[in-house]
Structure formats: C-alpha cells, structure tokens
C-alpha cells in the first residue's frame, strides 16, 4: 500500500489565449516536476489557454470570446494527446485545469491523467461563477466524476467556488480522496473596496483549510499568475479583478488543515513540492470522518441524480413513466 507520495503544485502564468504555446509550457512544467521526483503535478483553473480575466472588466468582448473559443482545448485533440504522452514519458499523474471546447461551447473542465497517459476522468464545473457565465456553460452531470484511483493515491478535483458548494463537497468527500486538487484563477489579497473576502487570497486559503479538515485529505491549492502581458492581452487594467500583476498563492494543506508549504511571491512563477505521508490521514480519521463514524445517515443523507444528461436521447433508452391502473 502506498504510504508516501511526492507532489508538485504549480504557480505559473500561461501563454495567454494561445493553445499551442500553453500546451508546450504545460509539458515543460510536467517534465520539470517529474525531474524533481514528483509523482503528481497540478494545474489551476482554465490553465489552458488562461483564465478569461476580461470578464471582470467588461460584460462582453466578442473579439476575445472568439479567440478564446478557438484556443480552448478539445479532449479528443492532438494537443491533449501531447499532454497525455508527456505524462506517460515522465511517469507522472497530471491534474489539468482547462477551458474545454466541446463543439465550440465552452466549459470549465478538469482532467486527471494517469502516469501511463490514460485519461482517468474528465469533469465540468457544476456551474460557472457570476461573470463566468458569459463564457462558459453548466455541467450536465459529469461534475460528479471527480475522484479516481491513481499511482499517486486516490485523487479528486474541484474548481474554484465549487469548494463552497456544500452538497458537491460532501459528494466528493464520500468518494474518499486522499489527495484533493483545488484549482483556482489568479487570486489577490483582500482590500476594503467592496470586494468579497471569500474571493481573496486569504478567503480562498481558509476555504482550502476547511476542505482539508472536513475531508481529512491533503489539499493542493493551485493558482495562476497574471503578469503585465496578460493584463495587456485582455485589457483588464481597469477591471474589478486581475488588474495588476500577481495572483499566485499556491499552497499545500495537510488533512488537519495545517499549511505544509512555504509561499512563492504572488507575481513569481514556480513549483511547490511536498512529500505527503498518508499516515497523517489516519491520524485525522481517528478523530473525525464526516462520511463515516462522525455522521448520522439515519438522520441526514445526500441524494444524487447521477449520470450525464445528453441533449439528444434515444426514446428507446429513455424511461417511460408507468401509470398504475386503478381497480374499478
């Protein structure tokens, strides 16, 4: 049984709105993490082709929206195949955040790629947050496909404010992750300008700690850096968010909520490493297991409507309601 694993959490800047260049940078970071002994490497929300930061500066930008569609990643594509091949060549698990292009509709998606290059699962964010809805669609059921067994342990992933969705979190906890990847866009310190603390560096770190404590898993809090090139590319200098260089606050939290990593300056790129000892999970589980001994399913339980809902369904495979015949 695996007892320890070395992980790598990126804090990096994509090549904004450039699919090919960001895929190349992804592979470079995968190789770097593997060369430093990592068995798993993580990437933030919409890492490919970069988070669409302009949505917080203006409600509509048709030119950038068109560019974004054309540079978003298709799961069945040569670009994804390149990332899979890189994972296999470096024998490392990859948890990838990306803007998914599915027939030119976009979704905030994550993929967990095995160390042999096989895609173990893909998932879409349950619901885009606020202005993200001007770009992205909702999941249609595959948001629940979030935890899989890998060579680095049992790994799960959620994106951004999915971490404040109590029912979705509990569903993920119940799948018994050992390592949780929390993918975020660029995040900034809270300021007294009317912005939400829960969207800040400090607020999201609190969310990560809470997730670790509630799930008794290691949380790999993965964020993006935005530099002046990104600000200029998306014209966000007058926006409410992501208007100045920075955004990085990647971190690693233990199953009792303690921070296990030292921060990288917010405007700098780098990779955070840690050796995770799964013994710490057992220490926490001995005290609390919200899906086990510290629960009351006879009183409170979660119902789930499972399965992916397709837009077109064959009537032959669609359940027909049965009407009971009343006796005369």
From Swiss-Prot:
Domain CN hydrolase: 5-278
Active site: 45, 125, 160
Protein's UniProt keywords contain Oxidoreductase: no
Top-level taxon: Eukaryota
Segments crossing the lipid bilayer: none
GO molecular function annotation: arylacetonitrilase activity; hydro-lyase activity
Gene3D superfamilies: Carbon-nitrogen hydrolase (3.60.110.10)
Record's protein name: Arylacetonitrilase
């Amino acid at each position: 049984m695996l007892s320890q694993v070395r992980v790598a959490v990126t804090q990096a800047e994509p090549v904004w709105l450039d699919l090919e260049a960001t895929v190349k940078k992804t592979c470079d970071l995968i190789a770097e993490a593997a060369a430093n002994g990592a068995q798993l490497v993580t990437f933030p929300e919409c890492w490919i082709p970069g988070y669409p930061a302009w949505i917080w500066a203006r409600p509509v930008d048709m030119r950038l929206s068109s560019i974004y569609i054309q540079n978003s990643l298709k799961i069945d594509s040569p670009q994804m195949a390149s990332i899979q091949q890189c994972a296999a060549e470096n024998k490392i698990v990859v948890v990838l955040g990306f803007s998914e292009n599915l027939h030119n509709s976009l979704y905030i998606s994550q993929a967990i790629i095995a160390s042999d290059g096989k895609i173990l699962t893909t998932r879409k964010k349950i619901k885009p947050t606020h202005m993200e809805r001007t770009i992205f669609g909702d999941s249609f059921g595959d948001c629940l496909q979030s935890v899989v067994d890998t060579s680095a342990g049992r790994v799960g992933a959620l994106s951004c404010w999915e971490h404040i969705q109590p029912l979705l979190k509990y569903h993920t906890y119940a799948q018994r992750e050992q390592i949780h990847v929390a993918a975020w866009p660029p995040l900034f310190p809270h300021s007294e300008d009317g912005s939400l603390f829960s969207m800040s560096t400090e607020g999201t770190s609190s969310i990560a700690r809470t997730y670790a404590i509630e799930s008794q898993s290691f949380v790999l809090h993965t964020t993006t850096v935005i530099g002046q090139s990104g600000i200029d590319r998306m014209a966000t200098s007058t926006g409410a968010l992501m208007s100045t260089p920075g955004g990085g606050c990647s971190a690693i939290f233990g199953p009792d909520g303690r921070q296990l990593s030292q921060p990288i300056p917010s405007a700098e790129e780098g990779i955070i490493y840690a050796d995770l000892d799964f013994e710490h999970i057992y220490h926490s589980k001995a005290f609390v297991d919200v899906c086990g001994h510290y629960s009351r399913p006879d009183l409170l339980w979660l119902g789930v409507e499972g399965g992916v809902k397709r837009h077109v369904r064959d009537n032959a495979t669609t359940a027909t309601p049965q009407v009971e015949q009343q006796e005369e």
